Curated annotation (Swiss-Prot):
The lineage of its organism: Bacteria, Bacillati, Bacillota, Bacilli, Lactobacillales. It comes from Streptococcus pyogenes serotype M1. Pathway: Cofactor biosynthesis; 7,8-dihydroneopterin triphosphate biosynthesis; 7,8-dihydroneopterin triphosphate from GTP: step 1/1. This is GTP cyclohydrolase 1. Toroid-shaped homodecamer, composed of two pentamers of five dimers. PROSITE patterns: GTP_CYCLOHYDROL_1_1, GTP_CYCLOHYDROL_1_2.
Amino acid sequence: MKRERLMSINKEKAEAAIYQFLEAIGENPNREGLLDTPKRVAKMYAEMFLGLGKDPKEEFTAVFKEQHEDVVIVKDISFYSICEHHLVPFYGKAHIAYLPSDGRVTGLSKLARAVEVASKRPQLQERLTSQIADALVEALNPKGTLVMVEAEHMCMTMRGIKKPGSKTITTTARGLYKESRAERQEVISLMTKD
């Protein structure tokens, strides 16, 4: 999959744009240290935007019927994304909980893969959180879904307000976890427990 995406970008156009950007900021793209920079940056962005054109729900290829009706939580799923407003990174951890319906569960790695696909594109943290939850709901139709994303945004660290270490936390709840405050609080306490 990764190789397909890397080959599908318009490398020439991306490299030319990066070359022009270097000129626009007053750099000489032909100096020794920058000679291969347009090529390297185009390749890096091909990797960073690997999720474009993909649907996170398609990552749920393994669905099993199990005698498990209690909450499933996978926490501390590391991710990196690019803020669509400033094109600088934001990164952190995603925590996903779902309450199976009719014993339908998925492979645990599929949750991490859905995070990977949803984060590998120009993104907003709020949308990322919702896209992960919606993908899980569409794939498994669980009784409840809760997604929490904690991230540090370089657009707040490197520029503007310049507040390194500040974290943004977003949550999205579906089904039972949206309807029941008590159920939601119980899952959030498990997600945030060390």
